[in-house]
Amino acid sequence: MDTQKVEQYAGVVRKVSKGLKIWNIIGIVGNVLGLLGMAILLIPQVQEQLATVKNPYLTKENIGFGIAVLVVFLLICIFSTILYHKIGESAKAQVLPDKNLLHYAIGVFAFSIVMQVVNQLMSGLGFDITAYIFPAIVAGLLAWVYVTYQKWEQEVAKK
């Protein structure tokens, strides 16, 4: 087993996991702010003013649906942050992280992409490919972590 390679692989996994964790913390803040904004729309005085606008997207039902979607995205961000933290902590100690953590992180990310597509299609605004620039970057980073993990696992198996 080449300890330099193990250190290098652990460093890559740790740094990318830290970056993804920070990205998810930003997502948590954004979702909380979005929830606050949506909650403001449910205040009776605001509802009275929205009734004069006659916008079909500003009904209580649509606002409630938006809140539900934001809550799901918030929970996804919280869960992903915990996963990336655990992966990063294992890598920091140069201990091979549990492979299931990577599988969970990839699964949660795939689920969030499906949720985003469904949300876009149900919103009536249509499909916008530009909304997937950052998810594509995150997918690339997750793939990089997974490939690095595989190399790290092979190096540890050489003992």
Segments and roles (model prediction):
Residues G27, G107-K151:
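Alpha-helical membrane-associated segments of multi-pass integral membrane proteins
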Residues F65-L83, P135-A139:
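Generic alpha-helical transmembrane segments
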Residues G37-A51, H85-A91, Q150:
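Membrane-helix exit/juxtamembrane interface segments
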Residues T81-N100, A139-K159:
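Cytosolic juxtamembrane helix at the C-terminal end of the final transmembrane segment
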Residues L50-L58, L121-F127:
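Membrane-interface interhelical loops and short amphipathic "cap" helices
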Residues M1-P44, P56-G64:
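Cytosolic juxtamembrane helix and N-cap/initiation of the first transmembrane helix
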